[in-house]
Amino acid sequence: KDYDNSDKNFPVIYMHDAQNLFDKKTSFAGEWEVDETLNKMNAQLIIIGIEHGNDKRIDELTPFTNEKYGGGNGENYVRFIIKTLKPKVDSLYRTKSNAKNTAIFGSSLGGLISFYAVIKHPNVFGKAGVFSPSFWFSDEVYSLMEKSETSKAKIFFLCGDKENETMVSDLKKMQTLLDRNRCYCLKL
């Protein structure tokens, strides 16, 4: 909000599925109203919305493969954010570029890839918003967590009260692993 009227640097949140973030005309299942919400909160940060490749969404947002759905190119997508997009954003805008001030948010498959990114690359992403994550896509996500190094990343999990039982149990399972394996999570 105050970007044009100051010379301060701002934290950055990278959000997946940009088609759904700002405009109901471009959204698949309803606008998230990110801009309206941040204005109401008077939040001083930069949001970078990353559009998905439509029929490539499953490939882009899944770090593991699934026998039925395929996927598995998520690391390439995350690497694009780290090696190409983030450096460009940091060079064009006044950002606070350290991990503490860089977050990654998403829902469903976007939640899965956000979780993966913050666990695999905590030196880049210090925070993650993981909303209704598709942990069902592959059990490898649990192995990843168990094998990961100690992290000071902050992870915010969210799922709605109308989610199916699998979503809630998957989130609780992951929260237990995170609590046991050294991560700082805001509770469900």
Task: Describe the role of every protein-language-model region.
Residues K1-L188:
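Non-catalytic cap/lid and distal C-terminal segments of serine-dependent acyl enzymes
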